[in-house]
């Protein structure tokens, strides 16, 4: 078991959120930081685009601009995510790769098990569904994405609780 530094929940804009994760990855890589779990929100609401996606393919940029929603690219893969300022908590887990299972599916399960434990402690009957989702009943409430770079793993994840679904579908393609 390793000790992690926990950064409590804070709101930042999309660009600051992604820059913080990149800076933390670099500090973990150089040994200047313990592994980190960071909880955060997006102010204003934002769309994060997976590393390998085309921004214009995934987001209606005119609608996002009109709604005051930032659009940013993540370091992690996966699909486009709408981050509702008032409806979700995002987490980043950043640590040396040797702290996590090498197998991608097992590493998602390893990290999501802790998210499940926290949700179940709060009375939420949630379950992990491979490869990287957490469901309550048949409703997805959490998804995550990873990257591994220079010996460091970064996993982003969201836990949804009150998303403006109408706005989300207006902005995501």
What are these regions (language model features)?
Residues 1-70, 74:
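Active-site loop/lid in soluble adenylation, ligation, and acyl-transfer enzymes
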Residues 15-17, 25, 51, 76, ...:
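Generic hydrophobic/packing signal
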Residues 47, 65, 74-76, 140, ...:
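Generic detector of intrinsically disordered, low-complexity, polar/charged segments
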Residues 58-97:
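A glycine-rich, hydrophobic loop/mini-helix early in the fold
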Residues 81-83, 88-173:
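Catalytic beta-strand/loop module used to bind and position nucleotide/cofactor moieties
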């Amino acid at each position: 078991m390793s000790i992690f530094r926990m950064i409590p929940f804070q709101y930042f804009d999309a660009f600051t959120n992604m820059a913080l994760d990149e800076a933390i990855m670099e500090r973990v890589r150089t040994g200047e930081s313990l592994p980190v779990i960071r909880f955060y929100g997006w102010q204003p609401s934002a769309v994060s685009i997976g590393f390998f996606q085309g921004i214009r393919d995934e987001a209606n940029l005119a609608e996002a601009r009109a709604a005051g929603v930032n659009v940013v690219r993540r370091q992690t893969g996966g699909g486009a995510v709408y981050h509702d300022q008032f409806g979700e908590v995002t987490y980043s887990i950043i640590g040396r790769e040797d702290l996590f299972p090498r197998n991608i599916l097992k590493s998602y399960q390893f990290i999501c098990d802790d998210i499940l434990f926290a949700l179940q402690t709060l009375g939420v009957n949630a379950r992990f569904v491979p490869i990287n989702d957490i469901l309550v009943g048949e409703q997805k409430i959490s998804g995550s994405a990873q990257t591994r770079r220079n010996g460091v793993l970064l996993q982003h994840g969201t836990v949804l609780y009150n998303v403006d679904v109408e706005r989300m579908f207006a902005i995501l393609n």
